[in-house]
């Protein structure tokens, strides 16, 4: 934080007046001896259509001449020059502790599903906090098993790590992160925190219902800054959720799951705020402090000695361009990246994870074992060879390939089908129950395909199945139908 705690308290209760309103940006004049510190929360009351409401701002700039520039966290309709503004003397604070579980909050920590008096918080923590010191950090290489074949085999997740789900519009990011909540939170048995950054109301409602049905809502806190809210709200909502997660990690010594959907909208909100503050834009119109803003968030999402925050973050890729500064800045902070492919999604193969571009820090024999590693490498080699042969196939046809290449293409097609899997979240669309496959069964299944043990089975038998038992059942049905 820029200011010390002493400086924050010194200006508590100071009164200023609004000098200018430009949309969500407000300039406020304070006495010379009571200028609010950066990040201080300011409040004012307005009456609109017969209703009185409190508007909260966050101090963002000192302009000189006793003026501060603040960003509103609510709509500024009805706000006029000369309105009195109070300095709280402290940053925005949110409730933390067991009392937040099972409830939905906004960026200010106000519950959206119950009255505020019903929340029994252990404490209120400011959302702007320092990242843990280097001495307190602890690295982790333990695998987090999800039961999804393509992820466990090719891009294994790390307990206490940061995981990114990258993809363009409509390729299944939100469905996959909801699937992770259903699977990991249910099997994890600990505390989860969900940050909806620029979330659609429909998606938020779907998530609430699914978590209730899965029985994980009672151990989860949800914090939403919806798509129709001001950019200041969308910029800070991830910090509000992270603060709740940090309390569970640091005070209650718990392992915490933190889900963020969507990091791109966090970046987008930062860009909007930067423009409103009059900063000169940087590459592709993004804010000049993009890397700094991302670092302030990501450096706090970490594991400390004895307890961890495991983070799963959905990241929208504008126009499927991975060189865009927003996704590119996020890459450096992640331990595992799962890239969703539009081309794979167009073939109806879900989850549409690209097996060749997705990565993991622990895809190494010393962490996951030789069998797992060797199978993952063989699968990638077959898929890469198949990709290289596609131009020849498109021009000359499969018949012009050598016998060896024909076998590679045949096995690659079976692998591609076997990487697809029914999910619990998608049951409402497909009518088919989801499946969970252990890492042992996953490795055995793909090893069998690579070794040619399943060359006699038609490739359609591998589509949207769990383990090899499902493949055998499908193959038996296909044979029965063709008799």
UniProtKB/Swiss-Prot annotation:
Keywords: ATP synthesis, ATP-binding, Cell membrane, CF(1), Hydrogen ion transport, Ion transport, Membrane, Nucleotide-binding, Translocase, Transport. Gene3D superfamilies: 2.40.10.170, Bovine Mitochondrial F1-atpase, Atp Synthase Beta Chain, Chain D, domain 3, P-loop containing nucleotide triphosphate hydrolases. It comes from the Bacteria. The keyword tRNA-binding does not apply. GO terms for cellular component: plasma membrane; proton-transporting ATP synthase complex. The keyword Metal-binding does not apply. ATP binds at residues 167-174. It catalyses: ATP + H2O + 4 H(+)(in) = ADP + phosphate + 5 H(+)(out). InterPro entries: AAA+_ATPase, ATP-synt_VA_C, ATP_synth_F1_bsu, ATPase_a/bsu_AS, ATPase_alpha/beta_chains, ATPase_F1/V1/A1_a/bsu_N, ATPase_F1/V1/A1_a/bsu_N_sf, ATPase_F1/V1/A1_a/bsu_nucl-bd. It is a peripheral membrane protein. F-type ATPases have 2 components, CF(1) - the catalytic core - and CF(0) - the membrane proton channel. CF(1) has five subunits: alpha(3), beta(3), gamma(1), delta(1), epsilon(1). CF(0) has three main subunits: a(1), b(2) and c(9-12). The alpha and beta chains form an alternating ring which encloses part of the gamma chain. CF(1) is attached to CF(0) by a central stalk formed by the gamma and epsilon chains, while a peripheral stalk is formed by the delta and b chains. NCBIfam families: atpD. This is ATP synthase subunit beta. The lineage of its organism: Bacteria, Bacillati, Actinomycetota, Actinomycetes, Micrococcales.
């Amino acid at each position: 934080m820029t200011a010390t705690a002493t400086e924050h308290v010194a200006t508590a209760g100071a009164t200023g007046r609004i000098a200018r309103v430009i949309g969500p940006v407000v300039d406020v004049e304070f006495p010379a001896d009571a200028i609010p510190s950066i990040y201080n929360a300011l409040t004012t009351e307005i009456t609109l259509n017969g209703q009185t409401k409190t508007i909260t701002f966050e101090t963002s700039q000192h302009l000189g001449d006793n003026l501060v520039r603040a960003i509103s966290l609510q709509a500024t309709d009805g706000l006029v020059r000369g309105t009195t503004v109070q300095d709280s003397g402290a940053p925005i604070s949110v409730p933390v502790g067991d009392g937040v579980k099972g409830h939905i909050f906004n960026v200010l920590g106000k519950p959206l599903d119950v009255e505020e008096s019903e929340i029994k918080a252990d404490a209120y923590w400011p959302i702007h906090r320092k990242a843990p010191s280097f001495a307190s950090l602890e690295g982790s290489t333990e695998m987090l098993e999800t039961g999804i074949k393509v992820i466990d085999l090719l891009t294994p997740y790390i307990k206490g790590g940061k995981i990114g789900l990258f993809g363009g519009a409509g390729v299944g990011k939100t469905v996959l992160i909801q699937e992770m909540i259903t699977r990991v939170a249910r099997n994890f048995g600990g505390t989860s925190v969900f940050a909806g950054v620029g979330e659609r109301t429909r998606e938020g409602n779907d998530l609430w219902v699914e978590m209730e049905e899965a029985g994980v809502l009672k151990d989860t806190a949800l914090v939403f800054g919806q798509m129709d809210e001001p950019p200041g709200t969308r910029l800070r909502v991830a910090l509000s959720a992270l603060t709740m997660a940090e309390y569970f990690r640091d005070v209650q010594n718990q392992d915490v799951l933190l889900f963020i959907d969507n990091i791109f909208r966090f970046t987008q909100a930062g860009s909007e705020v930067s423009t409103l503050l009059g900063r000169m834009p940087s590459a592709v119109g993004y804010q000049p402090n993009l890397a700094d803003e991302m670092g302030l968030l990501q450096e706090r999402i970490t594991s400390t000695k004895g307890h961890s925050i495991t983070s799963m973050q959905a990241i929208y890729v504008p126009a499927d361009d991975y060189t865009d500064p927003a996704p590119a800045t996020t890459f450096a902070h992640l331990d595992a990246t799962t890239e969703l492919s539009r081309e794979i999604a167009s073939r109806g193969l879900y989850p549409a994870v690209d097996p060749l571009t997705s990565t993991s820090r622990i895809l190494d024999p010393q962490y996951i074992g030789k069998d797992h590693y060797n199978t993952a490498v063989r699968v990638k080699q077959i898929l890469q060879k198949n990709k290289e042969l596609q131009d020849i196939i498109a021009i000359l046809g499969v018949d012009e390939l050598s016998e060896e290449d024909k076998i590679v293409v045949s096995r690659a097609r079976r692998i591609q089908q076997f990487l697809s899997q029914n999910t619990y979240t998608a049951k409402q669309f497909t009518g088919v129950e989801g499946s969970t496959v252990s890492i042992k069964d996953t490795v055995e299944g793909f090893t069998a395909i690579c070794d040619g043990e399943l060359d006699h089975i038609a490739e359609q038998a591998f589509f949207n199945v769990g383990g090899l038992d499902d493949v055998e059942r499908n193959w038996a049905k296909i044979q029965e139908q063709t008799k």
